[in-house]
Amino acid sequence: VAQSFDTRTGLLERFGRPLRLAILGGGPGSWIGHMHRSAAELDGWWRVVGGVFSGDPARSRDGGALLGYDRERCYGTLDELVAGERARPDPAEAVAIMTPNDTHYPLAAAALDAGLDVVCDKPATHDAAQARDLVARTQRHGRLFAVAHGYSAYPMTRYARHLVNTGAIGELRYVQVEYVQSGLAPRIEDAPQNNRLRWVLDPRRSGLALVMSAIGCHAQHLASFAVNRRVTSVCADAISVVPNRE
């Protein structure tokens, strides 16, 4: 059941070093940023070398330096990052995107066009048309595009897939997945405008699917991965359990 780490050995033998990763988003105060940064370097495959750590250029440069990165590689915009890294003998080879949902598609598209491989937090895009465009760009430029569905790497998830694939559980008849979070249970609508979670309730930024794109995609991916089957059609009931929240 357990998989060996031959892939890692081959990677390090081929390159002789970890791959160089730049971060988009995830600066000081980010809820998800430290998770991505820590996970990226956990097994020695990647080394975070810098990035764009905020939509505000000054905050990005200061925030990246505060996190301990070389200020020279703490950029104000993605364009600056691409230009700055191209001029180096040791440029970033991929970017990891951990920004609000509405920026995933334009950042990923620009990074792919710049010749960078991309690891993107979910949801990858707001709609299927954007997703298809990213697929086309990835193929056109010969790059790699990955979505950060990290739960599929958990040993228990891998073991569940193994049980299904080997027929150990018998005929598959029904799959039930629950993914519960309470992060939006408080009325953040009443919080100050600079509250870091307010954007999640704005469909223009979070996407029309709102919470379904934020955490429902995890449930969908876990189900698909564990049973090794693709979803072919969808039907859903959606309700709000917080008063006066659509």
Predicted regions and their residues:
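N-terminal Rossmann-like dinucleotide-binding module
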Residues: 2-69
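Hydrophobic beta-strand scaffold residues
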Residues: 47-48, 74, 118, 145
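A structured beta-alpha segment of the ubiquitous adenosine-cofactor-binding alpha/beta core
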Residues: 73-93
